[in-house]
């Protein structure tokens, strides 16, 4: 599966490393100093009580309108979403944008900009922090606390949701489908 991770913060870095380790074709979008740092050092994740992973990954600083991915996983803070929506909307080659952030406002703004058929909602089941050197210390949360979830707006099980939830498992990352997708964006 060809994926773009839109955002190179703690969660974007963590999911990029895990999905790359799981056999996916992953690119990360980072800007400015963070993009330069990734080009030099790669992505570095120290998973809690596990070994440190350092991976080389394709880095882009902008998403061209004709760049096609199976899915774009949008892992930015809620207060950054409005600023990234124009570049997501300009891209007509990607059929699916998975928004993974805490969003009390619900999905309507995303649907208004991108169209209902292009929006999936999710919630990350990981936590961590980024060190000054750019490395990330993170962990997958226990499923009892919070699974990584993804779902359609109407809760249906569709091929694109199943594709995200049944990918390679070598990364130790399990993504579950959710029939309550809009609720996942508020941490339910």
Summary of predicted features, one role per range:
Residues 1-47, 164:
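NAD(P)+-binding Rossmann beta1-loop-alpha1 motif at the extreme N-terminus of oxidoreductases
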């Amino acid at each position: 599966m060809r994926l773009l991770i839109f955002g190179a913060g703690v969660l974007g870095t963590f999911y990029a490393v895990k999905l790359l380790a799981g056999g996916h074709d992953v690119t990360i979008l980072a800007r400015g100093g963070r993009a330069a740092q990734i080009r030099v050092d790669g992505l570095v994740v120290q998973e809690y009580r596990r070994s440190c992973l350092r991976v080389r990954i394709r880095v882009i600083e902008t998403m061209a309108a004709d760049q096609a991915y199976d899915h774009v996983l949008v892992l930015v803070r809620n207060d950054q979403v409005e600023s990234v929506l124009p570049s997501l909307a300009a891209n007509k080659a990607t059929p699916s944008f998975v928004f993974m952030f805490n969003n009390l406002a619900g999905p309507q703004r995303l649907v208004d900009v991108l169209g209902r058929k292009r929006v999936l909602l999710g919630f990350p089941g990981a936590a961590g922090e980024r060190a000054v050197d750019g490395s990330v210390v993170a962990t997958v949360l226990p499923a009892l606390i919070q699974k990584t979830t993804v779902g359609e707006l109407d809760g249906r099980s569709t091929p694109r949701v199943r594709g995200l939830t049944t990918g390679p498992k070598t990364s130790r990352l399990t993504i579950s489908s959710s029939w309550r997708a809009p609720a996942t964006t508020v941490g339910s």
